[in-house]
Amino acid sequence: MKQPSALSSLVEALRALPGVGPKSAQRIAYHLMQHDREGAERLGRSLLFATEHLQHCEKCNTFTEAQICEVCSDDERDPTLLCVVETPADQIMLEQTMTYRGLYFVLMGRLSPLDGIGPKEIHFDRLVRRASDGVVKEVVLATNFTNEGEATAHYLGQTLKARGLAVTRLARGVPVGGELEYVDAGTIARAMLDRRTM
């Protein structure tokens, strides 16, 4: 039996989510249609609202509803410190530690040549312009401790050091292969406080 095209379309859309394969997508779709139509409608409205209202901050590239995000607009932040993270989720984890009071730049990814992700795709030129504004004195590389995250940190570190900037890297404590989004706030706080020069 062939499933209805509307259901097939929903399953395909759910497969676009990270970590959701064909079977999981099908289970989610059936659950929403069979047991939680109200939740499905709420999910649809929330997705539509987010796509219509969220944009990238003109300064740091994170998600925001305004041209400039709340962090970049905060005069209490230290503009001489610029922390580079892979995702907005990583930025939120660092913020929850309450140990970092500088500004951010969100790459929205990491270098991965095998996947076709190079410097352009991680907004490298924007980062260099931001870091070279004459105000930033130290760039903290807080990319994940995965192979791609380490390669990204190395590439960024070499390039930014060549421009005369002090470049530091989060200290270990964040497990090798670990992603900041899944690390507890205490470990991230310790890694931020013990960051090292590159």
Swiss-Prot record:
**GO BP, one example?**
DNA recombination
All copies of domain Toprim, residue ranges:
80-175
Q: Zinc finger (C4-type) locations?
A: 57-72
Q: Which SMART domains match?
A: TOPRIM (SM00493)
Keywords associated with the record: DNA damage, DNA recombination, DNA repair, Metal-binding, Zinc, Zinc-finger
Task: Tell me the InterPro entries matching this sequence.
Answer: DNA_Rcmb_RecR, Rcmb_RecR, Rcmb_RecR_Znf, TOPRIM_dom, TOPRIM_RecR
Looking up Gene3D superfamilies in the UniProt record yields: 3.40.1360.10, 6.10.250.240, RecR Domain 1 (1.10.8.420)
Q: Name one GO molecular function term.
A: DNA binding
Q: Which PANTHER family match?
A: RECOMBINATION PROTEIN RECR
* NCBIfam families (UniProt xref): recR
Q: Which family does it belong to?
A: Belongs to the RecR family.
Q: What does this protein do?
A: May play a role in DNA repair. It seems to be involved in an RecBC-independent recombinational process of DNA repair. It may act with RecF and RecO.
Q: By what name is this protein known?
A: Recombination protein RecR
Taxonomy, top ranks, is: Bacteria, Pseudomonadati, Pseudomonadota, Betaproteobacteria, Burkholderiales
In the UniProt record, the gene name given for this protein reads recR
